[in-house]
Regions:
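Single conserved hydrophobic/aromatic residue that forms the stacking wall/gate
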Residues: 175-187
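N-terminal Rossmann-like NAD(P)+-binding domain of SDR-like oxidoreductases, especially those catalyzing
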Residues: 1-178
């Protein structure tokens, strides 16, 4: 297994949305162990017990419980953190739930992305933004190999479609707010 040199993150201020979820918890643990100064912003953990609780992530990061749809609280938390790196994982990730409540899914996955990108746009501290989505953003062609980033976006269900929209919002921000000398936006 390849070993990664994580020394780059030593002392870096990193803002992680969705830090109480499974992926976000592991990401925060790795970043904290690498010496990053991590601020997490998320809803309460979705299960109890959760990895976030079991691994005691709150001890490793500045944990803020908040809703990505609440721009005022998000912005206040973001401004206080003054991050150099933003890793956006916050989402409504359950396909079945997206059918039951599509409005909430779109509000969280699309407008939540808009909200965090507005925080980035209105700051001078961020150098890198990563929007973590899913392979479900691509048109499902039922083939045996994995999808590539140049595949056609689609979204057959509200979850997948909302994550495709999130990709498009990030792409638009790349065109309109990204300054090559200051900020890299990646989705």
């Amino acid at each position: 297994m390849k070993q990664f040199d994580l020394s780059f993150y030593q002392g870096k201020k990193v803002f992680v949305t969705g830090h109480t979820g499974f992926k976000g918890s592991w990401l925060c643990k790795v970043l904290a162990n690498a010496g990053a100064i991590v601020t997490g912003y998320s809803l309460n953990p979705p299960t109890s017990p959760s990895l976030f609780e079991i691994a005691d992530i709150a001890q490793d990061v500045h944990s803020v419980i908040g809703d990505i749809r609440d721009y005022a609280t998000l912005k206040a938390t973001f401004d206080a953190a003054q991050p150099e790196i933003v890793l956006h994982l916050a989402a409504q990730p359950i396909v079945r739930d997206s059918y039951k409540n599509p409005a909430y899914t779109y509000e969280t996955n699309v407008m939540g992305t808009v909200n965090i990108l507005e925080c980035v746009r209105n700051s001078n501290c961020v150098k890198s933004f990563l929007n973590v989505t899913t392979d479900k953003v691509y048109l499902n062609k039922e083939w045996a190999w994995g999808y590539r980033e140049n595949e056609e976006l689609d979204g057959f269900d509200p979850y997948s479609n909302s994550k495709s929209c999130s990709e498009l919002v990030t792409h638009l921000s790349l065109i309109h707010i990204s300054e090559p000398t200051r900020l890299a936006l990646i989705s």
